[in-house]
């Protein structure tokens, strides 16, 4: 049986590894899929009102393409977030360290071990990096998706049948951002 100190150290290591893993929490997954669904459903209005594709007759097509696009956009969110999180953490490290050290010196008069201070700084740095990477990932991918949908729909595929235009523009847009998100830079 492992000593209690070993179990505590193992749980701290697990928490640290969890911060740097590609796995998303349930909250992040819900946020990503919720945003991806909304952004993927926006082009329905465009095709219903401008391209005159009937909502009822095209409901199955709209549903299938929205679900496929939702998955690909959420995949892009996750990939971009993972790449950005480490870059943001490195850039924000000094500022977060100063802020946490200042707050600890103001609020805590008791002596805190150096290890505990470092853990709090690391936790705060990861929290800030996670938040900033998440928001930027959503903004970047939403913007790119909607711009590509509009360009594809109105300029590249303008002479196609509206149904084909919808299928190609949505699949190309979501596929492109999913593909671009797999890059490491």
Swiss-Prot record:
This is Translocon-associated protein subunit gamma. The modification Phosphoserine is found at residues 11, 105. The lineage of its organism: Eukaryota, Metazoa, Chordata, Craniata, Vertebrata. GO terms for biological process: SRP-dependent cotranslational protein targeting to membrane. Its main location: endoplasmic reticulum. It is a multi-pass membrane protein. It is found in: Endoplasmic reticulum membrane. PANTHER family: TRANSLOCON-ASSOCIATED PROTEIN SUBUNIT GAMMA, TRANSLOCON-ASSOCIATED PROTEIN TRAP , GAMMA SUBUNIT. Heterotetramer of TRAP-alpha, TRAP-beta, TRAP-delta and TRAP-gamma. InterPro entries: SSR3. The gene is SSR3. It comes from Pongo abelii (Sumatran orangutan). Residues 49-54, 158-163 are cytoplasmic. Residues 1-27, 77-135 are lumenal. Belongs to the TRAP-gamma family. TRAP proteins are part of a complex whose function is to bind calcium to the ER membrane and thereby regulate the retention of ER resident proteins.
